[in-house]
A protein has these predicted regions:
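Bacterial N-terminal signal peptides that target proteins for export
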Residues: 1-10
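Bacterial Sec-dependent N-terminal signal peptides
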Residues: 3, 15-42
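First exposed extracellular module after export/assembly in secreted or surface-exposed proteins
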Residues: 29-179
C-alpha cells in the first residue's frame, strides 16, 4: 500500500512537472524591439525667429546656418517614416525609456557651445535626456556636429561618443556654419 502511494505521488509530480515545462509558444515575445529611425527633425529657435531642419535617411548633406552671438534653443525629434501614410514619432518611447536613452551632440569645435536646456526631459536620476539643448554661436566658422541617439549608455556624461558606451540607435553629422 505504501508503495502504491509513493508511485501515485511520483506520477503526479512527474505529470505536473511535465506540464509546467512544456509550452506551445515557439516564438518568444520580443521585449524591446529596436525602432527604425529614418527621419530626424531639428527645430531651432532664437529671439530672431525659428527654423526647422529635416533629415531623411539617404540624404547626403545635412547643413544649417547660425548667426554669431546668438543663443538658440534646439529640439530634436526622431521618426520612423518607413510608411509615409503612417509616420511614427519615436520621441514618446525615448522619453518613456529615458533611463535607457541619451541624446548627445559631439562637438569638438569652439564656434558653438552646447548645453542641456532647462526644459529638457530627465531620466529617473535627474540626468537630462538631451532632446532639448541650448546652442550658443560663439564666433564665425564652420564645424561638423555629430548627433547620437544612444541606447543603454553606461554613463550620461562625457565629451566624446566613446565616453558613453551603449549602442548607437542613430547618428547624424550636421554641417554647421556660423556667420
Amino acid at each position: 500500500m505504501k508503495l502504491f502511494n509513493y508511485t501515485k505521488y511520483a506520477l503526479l509530480f512527474f505529470a505536473l512537472f511535465s506540464f509546467v515545462q512544456c509550452s506551445d509558444d515557439e516564438t518568444p515575445e520580443l521585449i524591446n524591439e529596436e525602432e527604425e529611425i529614418n527621419r530626424i527633425v531639428i527645430d531651432i529657435s532664437s529671439e530672431n525667429g525659428s527654423n526647422t531642419y529635416t533629415w531623411n535617411e539617404g540624404d547626403s548633406n545635412f547643413a544649417m546656418q547660425l548667426n554669431s552671438g546668438i543663443n538658440y534653443t534646439v529640439a530634436v525629434s526622431f521618426y520612423n517614416a518607413s510608411d509615409p501614410n503612417d509616420v511614427e514619432a519615436i520621441n514618446p518611447e525615448v522619453i518613456e525609456e529615458a533611463d535607457e536613452h541619451h541624446v548627445f551632440f559631439e562637438n569638438s569645435s569652439s564656434i558653438l557651445t552646447i548645453n542641456s536646456a532647462s526644459s529638457d526631459q530627465q531620466d529617473s536620476s535627474g540626468n537630462p535626456l538631451g532632446l532639448k539643448t541650448t546652442w550658443t554661436a560663439e564666433r564665425a566658422g564652420s564645424a561638423t556636429i555629430r548627433l547620437f541617439l544612444i541606447h543603454e549608455p553606461n554613463t550620461k556624461s562625457g565629451n566624446t561618443r566613446s565616453d558613453f558606451g551603449g549602442e548607437t540607435d542613430v547618428q547624424l553629422d550636421i554641417n554647421v556654419t556660423v556667420e
